[in-house]
Every structure is written in C-alpha cells, then in structure tokens.
C-alpha cells in the first residue's frame, strides 16, 4: 500500500497540521498510560528537525460535540511537554482567534497543541466548513493518528483533501506491519482474540479464518461460544443474539481447517467486582449464580504450548476481567508467553497493550499497534477513511 511519505519533503518554516492519537487513559486528572504519546514522537522529532512549525490536534474520549473539562487535553499536554525539547504551547480552543494567532506566532521547530477536536460536533460529522477552519491553521497536513484512521472525521479525512497531505512515520509503520501480517505471515499463524463481546469481533474472526492456523478465544466473548455448544456458563456474559453466529464460527473453523480453541477451565466469581469470591472450575461448566471472569490454568497451559510454536502471533483483547487484579492472571500469562515466543508478534487493543506494559515486556514485542478499533477494522479487510484520503494524494 503506497502512502505519501514525509521524509523527502521540505517543511522548513511551514506550518504543519499534525493529527495524532493522544486518546490516552486519564484517572483523577493524570495520564495513566502514555504509550500513544510516545509512539508518535519519531514523527514529531522529524518535523522539528525539518524546521516545521507544528500544530498538533487530537481527540480525547467522547465529549459528544460539547466542551467538557473532563475531556480536556490539558493534562496530556503537560505529559507531552516532558517528552519533547521544543517549546510547546496550548490553545484552549480548537478554532477561532486564539489558535490562529498562536499558529502564526510559532517559530521553526515549535509546537502548538489545540484543544480536543471533538469539542465540536462538526468534527465527527466531517463537516466541510469545519475542515476548512482546521486547514486554515496550516500549510501542510500530516496524519499520524492510525488509532483514529477508521473514522471519517474532519481532522482525519476532510482536511486531507484541502492541503498537501502525508502519512506520519507511525501511520506508515502501522500499515506496513499489519499489511504484512495479512499478506505473508510466517507459519503457524496464531490469532488470540479476547474481549467481552463476540459482536465486536465477528467480522475480524471471519476474515482471519482463511489466514490463521490457530484461533485462541478468551475473555467474556468465550462464554457465548461455550453456551452455543450447550456448555453451562452460569451467570456469565452471553450475547444471546450471537449464539447462532458463534456456533457457525466454530463449524466454519472446522471446515477451514483452523484449530479454534476455547477455554477448558475458568476462574469464576460470584459477583462482578473486586470483592467477589473466586474458585476454579473445569470444562464441566460454570455453576448458576457464578460467572466466568478469567481463563483457568489448564487453558493458559494449552494456549502457551500453541504460542511457543508459533511463527506469527496477533493478539487483540484480554483473556478475562483484566481491570480487576484477581482476574488478570490469564491475560498476564498470555502477555508473558507471547514475549517469550520467537514469532513475529503484533499486539493491539488497550487492555492487551496495558498487560504488555504491566508485564514489562513491551521491548519483546515486534509491533504494538496504537489502533484498537482501527487495527481490528484493518484486519477485517475494511478500508480506513483516514488512510484512503492519503492514498488519493498519491494518485493525484
């Protein structure tokens, strides 16, 4: 996939509108994981080296088109300032007099971060007038926000048609790594898919069947699969509307010659919180009044053996209720198993990345994808609007 590249473009003295994905987790006003900020630093450092005047834009959370202090980028900017050596300024508004004035005052290599673009409903509506107001801040557009590339929004798609547009280094790396994963994976190719809902993973599971050798299922979605096979799942999360599709996926795996693995034992809880009583149960099923909260030790062992012999691994989604420590064991075990593998490893999705970081094995992973939904949609074989807008620039 050919994308317009930054490396050979003269950007000295030019204002560059850089769309990044600074949609990071924040608790009590503090950034708790700065992975997405760090991942875009190579592009920012390249722009600084080229003497560009950088205007950074990002979304944060879902403020529903209204100004909401809870979703302000201010705490993100404070973290960002500690990661770059250039002067960093912050505009408390997205469009209007303040960002226009500040963008014109920038010197070569300096950075202006504008407020959360989703404070304006026109952003998600991809409203042409709003795109023009964003474009008025700059001479050149660079998209490094792979995590938002599946959205046809003003700052990810609309603006790309109004300025000379290029892919950032992270955007390019994401596309190269994920394309290779689908086109020429080393065998055996193992996909580990977790998370709470089958409904959000149906399409990617279907698209992976003709590409993978092993499909390992975990997380809450596993219980819809097990229920479809008449395994007692107690009070576990089950999407009743997707039981038939889950059963069809199991059958499809058999026809395609894909080894689809489901949990054979579980860590269960009597309530969905940290105070829950816990016990381990085997494949005979889960008792009424109890719910599956994590994969058990036998399942971990089964999955570890398959991971050890893999040539390529793609992991998206936790194996249990990872945010609760007593149910994080399965996810952490998978993170460590993947880190020990000699395979090419690609990890995507917030909880999976959090587990990799918590296990302190990020340096052992070939590629950590910053795109949760975007990487899934790419793996589904879908076109990403933010990427398509850049591809059009190559053909023009």
Swiss-Prot record:
Record's catalysed reaction(s): (2R)-3-phosphoglycerate + ATP = (2R)-3-phospho-glyceroyl phosphate + ADP
Listed transmembrane segments: none
Keyword Cytoplasm included in the entry's annotation: yes
InterPro entries (UniProt xref): Phosphoglycerate_kinase (IPR001576), Phosphoglycerate_kinase_CS (IPR015911), Phosphoglycerate_kinase_N (IPR015824), Phosphoglycerate_kinase_sf (IPR036043)
Enzyme class: transferase
Known partners and oligomeric status: Monomer.
Protein name: Phosphoglycerate kinase
Organism: Leptospira borgpetersenii serovar Hardjo-bovis (strain JB197)
């Amino acid at each position: 996939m050919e994308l317009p590249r930054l490396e050979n473009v003269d950007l000295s003295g030019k204002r560059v509108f850089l769309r990044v994905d600074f949609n990071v987790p924040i608790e009590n006003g503090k950034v708790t994981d700065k992975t997405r900020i760090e991942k875009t630093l190579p592009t920012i450092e390249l722009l600084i080296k080229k003497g560009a005047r950088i205007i950074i834009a990002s979304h944060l959370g879902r403020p529903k088109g209204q100004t909401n202090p809870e979703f302000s980028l201010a705490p993100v900017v404070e973290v960002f300032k500690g990661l770059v050596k250039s002067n960093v300024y912050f505009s408390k508004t997205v469009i209007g007099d303040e960002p226009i004035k500040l963008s014109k005052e920038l010197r070569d290599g300096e950075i202006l971060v504008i407020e959360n673009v989703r404070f304006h409903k026109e952003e998600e509506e991809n409203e042409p007038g709003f795109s023009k107001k964003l474009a008025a801040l700059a001479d050149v557009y660079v998209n490094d926000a792979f995590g938002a590339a599946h959205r046809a929004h003003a700052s990810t798609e609309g603006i790309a048609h109004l300025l000379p547009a290029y892919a950032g280094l992270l955007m390019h790396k994401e596309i190269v790594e994920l394309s290779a994963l689908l086109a020429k994976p080393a065998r055996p190719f193992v996909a580990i898919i977790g998370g709470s809902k089958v409904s959000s993973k149906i399409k990617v599971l279907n698209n992976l069947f003709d590409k993978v050798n092993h499909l390992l299922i975990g997380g809450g979605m596993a219980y819809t699969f097990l229920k479809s096979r008449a395994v007692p799942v107690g009070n576990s999360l089950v999407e009743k509307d997707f039981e038939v599709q889950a059963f069809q996926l199991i059958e499809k795996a058999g026809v395609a010659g894909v080894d689809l693995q489901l949990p054979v034992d579980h860590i269960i809880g009597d309530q969905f919180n940290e105070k829950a009583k816990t016990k381990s149960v085997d494949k005979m099923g889960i008792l009424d009044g109890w719910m599956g909260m994590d994969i058990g030790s036998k399942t971990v062992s089964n999955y570890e053996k398959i991971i050890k012999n893999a040539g390529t691994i793609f992991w998206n989604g936790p194996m249990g209720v990872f945010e609760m420590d007593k149910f994080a064991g399965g996810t952490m075990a998978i993170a460590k198993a993947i880190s020990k593998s000699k395979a090419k490893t690609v990890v995507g999705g917030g909880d999976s990345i959090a587990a990799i970081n918590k296990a302190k094995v990020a340096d052992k992973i070939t590629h950590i994808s910053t795109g949760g939904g975007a990487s899934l949609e790419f793996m589904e074989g879908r076109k990403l609007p933010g990427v398509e807008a850049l591809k059009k620039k190559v053909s023009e």
